[in-house]
Amino acid sequence: MGPIDTSQRLARLRELMQERKVDVYIVPSEDSHQSEYIAHCDGRREFISGFTGSAGCAIVSMTKAALSTDGRYFNQAAKQLDSNWILLKRGFENMPTWQEWTAEQAEGGKVVGVDPSLITAFDARNLSETIKKCGGSLLGVQENLVDLVWGTERPARPSEKVALHPIEFAGKSFEEKISDLRKELQKKKCAGFVISMLDEIAWLFNLRGNDIPYNPVFFAYAIITQSTADLYIDEEKLPAEVKNYLGDKVSLKPYGSIFEDAKVLGQSAQNKSDGEASTKPPQKFLISTRASWSLSLALGGEKNVEEVRSPITDAKAIKNEAELEGMRACHIRDGAALSEYFAWLENELVNKKTVLNEVDASDKLEQIRSKHQHFVGLSFDTISSTGPNAAVIHYKAERNNCSIIDPKAVYLCDSGAQYLDGTTDTTRTLHFGEPTEMEKKAYTLVLKGLISIDTAVFPKGTTGFALDAFARQYLWKEGLDYLHGTGHGVGSYLNVHEGPIGLGTRVQYSEVAIAPGNVISDEPGYYEDGVFGIRIENIIMAKEVKTTHKFGEKPWLGFEHVTMTPLCQKLINPSLLSDAEKKWVNDYHTEIWEKTSKYFENDELTRNWLKRETQPI
């Protein structure tokens, strides 16, 4: 998708900034719940900049505008930003961070404004300090200025119905989860926990929604104390079945009343603290480090609030047996769907010489997936990319702006689905003609990295930060690399990107150790701008493994892969694989055949394709 002219939007925004005596205005990607994926009504950064990627921050001064994003989106942003914008490439040498660039624009006593509901309290403090060093100041602007520019064209906030997530898939009742949470709160001697992250609320109450595309969550807040559980949600979203399910164990309150109630709680905590002996530390409310500045301020700020990594995030990341079994089951069905799709696509392109574009193909994949048990929808927008488009890491094909699939070029498909029993995310790179030697080399080096993570054995306490290099080592030896993380946590019929664990160089991945029950993607890649892109992605689950020795008496961990989709035999150069790696590929393909071939007893086309693609190398 090419650039749109943002001149009028920026001019109107600058008028509003001038009226409010704001010199620089920040437009984050996130919504008021700090969601990575957002509802259309919260797409403020996309509206003002024209950049449609899921990550980034826009900064507008009276004379300049900048967009900062990470390596996944450099190519996309360069294509989508018009001449009004400067692209700040995050992580590039000699390139300022968006915070540094903002501070530069604030030199000489200028005021930087931001909607306090769209930035975390932690980030607001750090940003304020950075700006102060340049002589500027940070101001929370309660009225969102981009919303005013957007006006009546801004989409309405979704209000979809909420549904129960059955215990057979959740594995634990919401009463048990709240009880576990209260034990954690008791350990921390706090007054309660104010929850703002949407996936945490959905997980805690065993509820699912449809307010954000691809993410089965709903707009809500919650406050849990030792004696109360309050859910802040628009009541019309709750069917009678859900209200009966929650019963008298949960008090329902209007979504919009959270900030007033937070102010009351904050004042109450302060009054209680003031009235007690000074030797007794005051009980604070916990909020996530991802909670908004607005929420922190409503509770009374730092004197009443302790920011922590959410105990719900930690609990949610360790899947129980029902969730793990669901992930295994849904990936078998999803693998069958992908095999059917790839067999169909090859037949159409090679045998029938059908002309298909990238969107035609992704639509067919969704149609095939939708036939399978427990299918709800996609878990993200399918990346269906041919040739040079595959080098755009988060490429998005549009109906009126996409390419015809070239059977003589690399085809990269990164896709996933939401099933009642789990969430999938799989990437396969294929070639329907004769790949070049460089394409085969790149694919095989990426495959070696994937196998290295899959077969890794490591002591308890090891982080995803430490494991990341396992996946890159073979590319590094050739002077190659990729500009994205190696893996992210995956939810159980929840967000496809889930913290706090992952594989990569982000600071957060050095803070939390991999633990049994974690579900993570394993997705190394390699990209040549304007030529081709390679990525292979499996979902893996951490587990305890037996070792010959047990140094330090620690448990040792490894992974179980659950993705059941064949690799592309045509792109593998066996001479670059060790005997152990060849055995891994052959064993993996045997497992795929055994688990998915039953779906094709009456589908000769797919069965023959699957048989061919799972032959020993």
From Swiss-Prot:
Mn(2+) 1 binds at D425, E523, E537. One of its GO terms (biological process) is proteolysis. Binds 2 manganese ions per subunit. Its cofactor is Mn(2+). GO terms for molecular function: metal ion binding; metalloaminopeptidase activity. Mn(2+) 2 binds at D414, D425, E537. Pfam families: Creatinase_N (PF01321), Creatinase_N_2 (PF16189), Peptidase_M24 (PF00557), Peptidase_M24_C (PF16188). InterPro entries: Creatin/AminoP/Spt16_N, Creatinase/aminopeptidase-like, Creatinase_N, Pept_M24, Pept_M24B, Peptidase_M24_C, Peptidase_M24B_aminopep-P_CS, X-Pro_aminopeptidase_P. Keywords: Aminopeptidase, Hydrolase, Manganese, Metal-binding, Metalloprotease, Protease. Its EC number is 3.4.11.9. Catalyzes the removal of a penultimate prolyl residue from the N-termini of peptides. Belongs to the peptidase M24B family. This is Probable Xaa-Pro aminopeptidase P. It comes from Ajellomyces capsulatus (strain NAm1 / WU24) (Darling's disease fungus). The gene is AMPP.
